[in-house]
Amino acid sequence: MSRGASAAHSRASGNPGESSAFAARLTGSPLSRGRADHEISVAGVALIADPTGAVYWPDEALLVVADLHLEKGSAFAARGVLLPPYDTATTLAALARLIARYAPRLVVALGDSFHDRGGPFRMTGADRAEITVLQRGRDWLWIAGNHDPDLPDGIGGRFAGTLALGPLTFRHEPSPDQCDGEIAGHLHPQARIARRGRAVSRRCFASDGKRLVMPAFGAYAGGLNVRDRAIVALFGALSFTAHMLSERRIYAVAAAKCLAD
């Protein structure tokens, strides 16, 4: 995500354990009946949206995650902003659980996998070894992002600007034109709703059935409100759905019912 847009981000809530109360508040809501096996159809392709923010395409055994932002903590530390230096290990552990759950043939990391070009060089040996383990026995594709337009040798996997597979195109930054079948990241969508007298914000998928913008997967990645014009402009109006993440379920909420910041 660009530096300017990052400034508009709220700080990540990050802890999925906080979502249990959110789920309780949404129980029985007319907006959604939360599902663990939440399906989102994009250009006629049935995808499984995981409550962690990943997408699985069963027909292709393909797992997609966006905006890992590995080594964001160490990047901030270098500028004097001290954060616990465990974001890379936390993000990789969450990804390992996903891979164990879905056993994908191909993993696609949808850009901004590293917070900056120096990220791969700041990784601990243990974290680098974990990436090697995760890549074992499957294809792995790093999509170029604005934070990581190229990656050094030795990180494993393949590197590309986009991936076209069947009716779907995977890229980091959403195209400004209406693009059927596009799956992108970059914007870190987050939805905000009012429930029982308080506002609740959660990461979300944003989709109108033609295109899908994925939430950021990284432990320290923030979120941009789905009512922000950068997201609304992609869909032409508020005629899309925010699929809000909870600890174990996803809740579909009409974007028009979401709150602005």
Task: Walk through the language-model features, giving the residues of each.
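Extended recognition/assembly regions associated with phosphoester-bond processing machinery
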Residues: 2-4, 9-11, 15, 20-261
